[in-house]
Amino acid sequence: MQTGRDEPILEPDLPIIDAHHHLFDRPGLRYMIDDYLTDTRAGHRIVASVYVETLAFARTDGPSVLRPLGEIEFANGIGAMCDSGRYGCRACAAIVGHADLQLGDQVAKLLDQAMERAPERFRGVRQVTIEDPSDVPYRFIPNRPPGGVMKSPGFRPAFAHLAARGLSFDAAVFHHQLPEVIELADAFPDTTIVLNHCGHAMAMELNATARERVFHDYRRLMIEAGLRPNIYCKVGGLGMPFWGFRFEERRDAIGYRELAKAWRPYVETTIEAFGVNRCLMESNYPPDGRSAGFVPLWNALKYIVRSASADEKAALFHDTAARVYRIRVPVAQPGKATST
């Protein structure tokens, strides 16, 4: 994990809702609430966060469709603890739980029980659907997702249950799968889809010419996705190996300017495609910690958009996430207290 906590904090007073992070305790990798709170106290003003599923703490018995409730209950407990205000950041203020949408109408029972158990925080579901014809990216994916999830017979019947409950869908795909997300958005215009990680250009182990070709295709597809008003996009996830930056191979501390230089084309493409009112800044911690310390990561995102107006920065770093995930947290302003 990169650290880089000695960097000066850019715009330290800017309120941030971290739109995407995880907590888990796995062999060889433990990142729990104390670890996350340590990162949030490093200088950036993280006021709240969105917990996103990794099937951590899922139940190990009972009906398979309901097993994700274990993780939702775990995250809800953390959210309740942090909502006391004793810990600074209101971590897990919103929860995106797991659902196996291949199970069709059975998923309705999971959604209803999740809403009963975490009514103030459960806001949507995610099912990782990334696919690639090569085996290269799967070296970094602990549990290889099944193929063809979005085309499975049960997927759309399950997906149809989200909008009526006011729930969103977090889409985790590679860039070449964006046509499937676009098709889904067109078929369900009343369902909010939140694209993860800047659309996730898959460019591992490619030469410069091939990377340029990937970026051209990526940009075209992102602009097309941005034409759908019900698709939003998280800005981050750029510290993962799939982008091909190879920062994860480095042992020296990587500063925010170097990160910003590499990440800028993808961040700018995302914001151009979706606009600030449909973009949400994320840490994607701890996965992005392979390449970027928590402080340099947020510094890099701030640096890339440094020319944006105050209102645009508020939307990118706080307001869009608050609106999409219905998060209400007190934000102390200099000389007064307000709520968002």
Question: What feature does the model see in each segment?
Answer:
Residues P146-L280, S291, S309, P334-S339:
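Catalytic pocket-lining loop regions of alpha/beta-barrel enzymes
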